[in-house]
Amino acid sequence: MKQFRRVMLFLLDSVGIGALPDAEKYGDAGTATIQHTLEGNPGLTLPNLERLGLMKIPGMEKFATGAKPQGVYGKCRELSKGKDSIVGHWEVMGVPTRMAFDTFPEGFPQKIIDAFTKMIGRGILGNEVASGTEIIARLGEEHQKTGFPIVYTSADSVFQIAAHEETVPLATLYQWCQMTREMLDNMGFGVGRVIARPFVGTPGNYVRTANRHDYAACPPEQTDLEILTESGIQIHSIGKPVDIFPEAKFTSTVKTSDNFIGMGEALKAVREKEGLVFINLLDFDMKWGHRRNVAAYGAGLKAFDDYLPLFQDAMDDNTLLVITADHGCDPTHTGSDHTREHIPVLLWHRGITPGAAGIRETFGDVGATILKALGAPSPKVGNSIL
């Protein structure tokens, strides 16, 4: 395998490709994010992803048009327990989660709420499992009258704090979240993420803003990102990776508010950066998957597909393109939570020999491939696909 100057890793957040064998345990039997999105959007085609091999991946054959693959293609099983962003990202970077994070299907225990309210000096609203947009619509007006933050969770391991930007300044909300991260760690609760969920607007017209910020738990072991750094190889974050890996020493970070900004920043980075450029495109998950918007999810896939030729044209001979995901969020499934699925993996560089990578045993094969491509030592978990 040749060495590359840079690897461009696009992680399409929640773009799963079919239920894992144990999906039924998670209430996700039969889920298939990409497949059901295509079925729910008659006439939708993804010709550029198909050229990379997407429709040759097991489970995608019915959508094939006969285009000859030009890349390496496959899908990965998950070793970790769980189905959220932390678990998926960590395993992609070589650290499967052996113990599931704590979840709170009945809301947070009183001792957590008591500690939180004492810490911030005021009460709370909520403390329930809820959709973010729904609970803001329901409790937003009371929040603005009282100044009490809205605290809620989901099926994932998250402690979410919502506040109106004119009622609780962003700096205060972020401080609360950082303090909560430390509080939960000190209390011995394994919570994957504390998330600031700011919103604006008036009663009946509240909308969440792009000022979300995640405060993630630190991985229990060294990730592939540290291996790259210790090898003298740069790592760059576009979007969410810097929030998911708080211990990583990113050479540069760029915040993004939507997929289009992320894709634009990636186009600049492929011309300017070296090492690993890690791009998370979050709209698939946050704006369309959780909201079960099949049409918008399809439009998002189409927008990325349309972008691919422009991006590939900007790649030189020393650049490897990797496309993958972290979990599913099937927009046709019941509820609003993530779905436990395989993730796709598509690889392309100039001169690549096309072929099938099969069904891989761990998401960690993605990270292992990146390490090998950049000339770094092999990880403990994962085997290179190339």
Predicted regions located by residue number:
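Feature captures the catalytic ectodomains and active-site-proximal regions of enzymes
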Residues: 1-386
